[in-house]
Structures are given as C-alpha cells and as structure tokens.
C-alpha cells in the first residue's frame, strides 16, 4: 500500500468515527506520514477529541470496531489536544491532518 492509499483509508475512517464521536481532528502518523512505511506497516491513526468522555472504555473499543469496517491495518489511538503528551506533540510535528 502506498501513502495515498493509506490517506484514503484514513479519510473513510474519519467519516465513520465522526458519526459516533465528537471528533476534533484525525491524523495519519507513524511510518506512513514519515515516508518509511513497508508492505508490513500498519496505519497509525490518532483520533483527537476535545476531552475524554466518561465512556473512555467504551469509546476505545468503538474505534477498534469501526476500523474493522474500513481496514484491519488501522491502529487507532484516542487522544486529547494535550501538548504535554509526547505522542501528541510528535503527531503535531510529523502527522498528516486528515
């Protein structure tokens, strides 16, 4: 899979997530955004919400359930816009806003 195919899958995933969660942003990050992906790479996606809901333990499995409808290569992570979070800070630097 090439970078543009990963972006297309991320766009489809964003549409599915936006129907179920109050989505603030969605980023493609990791190997596809950095350009060092291989044929075995997963598709790292950061789902950014304004704040975590009380249903975090329901929201996270929902992300995994929705990914199965798009591609099992998608590896979602649920985040807030906490710039003190090293993962989120890295995503802001190297990720692709979808």
What residue spans do the PLM features occupy?
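Short beta-strand->loop micro-motif that forms the acidic, two-metal-ion catalytic signature
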Residues: 45-47
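Catalytic core of pol beta-like nucleotidyltransferases
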Residues: 1-25, 33-39, 50-98
């Amino acid at each position: 899979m090439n970078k543009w195919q990963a972006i297309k899958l991320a766009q489809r995933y964003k549409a599915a997530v936006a129907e179920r969660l109050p989505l603030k942003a969605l980023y493609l990050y990791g190997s596809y955004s950095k350009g060092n992906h291989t044929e075995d790479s997963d598709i790292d996606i950061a789902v950014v919400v304004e704040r975590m809901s009380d249903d975090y333990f329901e929201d996270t499995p929902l992300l995994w359930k929705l990914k199965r409808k798009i591609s099992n290569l998608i590896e979602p992570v649920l985040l807030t816009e906490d710039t003190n979070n090293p993962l989120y800070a890295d995503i802001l630097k190297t990720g692709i806003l979808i």
